[in-house]
Amino acid sequence: MKPLILALGVVFAVGSPSAQTPAWPPSPGHAQVPIWPGVVPDAQPVEGPEESGTVVDRVGSKKLVAGRPWAYVGRVSQPTMTVYSPEGSNTGAAVVVFPGGGYNILAIDLEGTEVCDWLTSKGITCVLLKYRVPCVKSGPYLDCRTALEDAQRTVGLVRLQAAPWHIDPHKIGVLGFSAGGHMAAAIS
């Protein structure tokens, strides 16, 4: 009887493996690097673990953009950056990309990895930021101080790592979509 109770306790404590969505992994050959050492500053509580998946509409059909479904990441509490280096010639320029998603999720492929693939094909290093979402709602607007902190920190880290990453520190730009565009304007 005790082994059965123990087994049920483990199942209820951990949950079903199929019920847990794995966190977003970058493409092979790329690694997510935490942007904050140790404890993340101004950490906000996030309900549940980080999630990733394909965006669906209200009836459960995959939402398509240009005929393709798109992936999202949500409930991000540990922000990371993923560096995509140019495979051919390197211009020395770098762009930090902030995906959009209304400060609730991140459109990680459509406004992230696909953009990085295009930038690297042009000889530009791309740094994809997976910033903290969702943001805290404050009145009619979202208070996204934590996402802005992540953006500022990432640009600073890119400048710090410019030499080893073969980047000219005077050629670092930012590019954002939707909420990410708001962040790009805020730190410019």
Residue ranges and their predicted role:
Residues R159, G181-S188:
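Short glycine-enriched nucleophile-adjacent loop
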Residues T91-G100:
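Short beta-strand element of the alpha/beta-hydrolase
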Residues I108-L128:
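Short amphipathic alpha-helix adjacent to the substrate-entry channel of hydrolases
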Residues I5-G15:
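Bacterial N-terminal signal peptides
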Residues V39, P99-N104:
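Active-site glycine-rich loops that stabilize anionic/oxyanionic intermediates
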Residues L142-T146, L157-V174, S178:
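Gly/Ser-rich "nucleophile elbow"/oxyanion-hole loop immediately N-terminal to the catalytic nucleophile
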Residues G38-P86, A93:
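Aromatic- and Gly/Pro-rich amphipathic surface segment
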Residues G100, S178-G181:
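Active-site loop->helix "elbow" adjoining a glycine-rich segment at hydrolase catalytic centers
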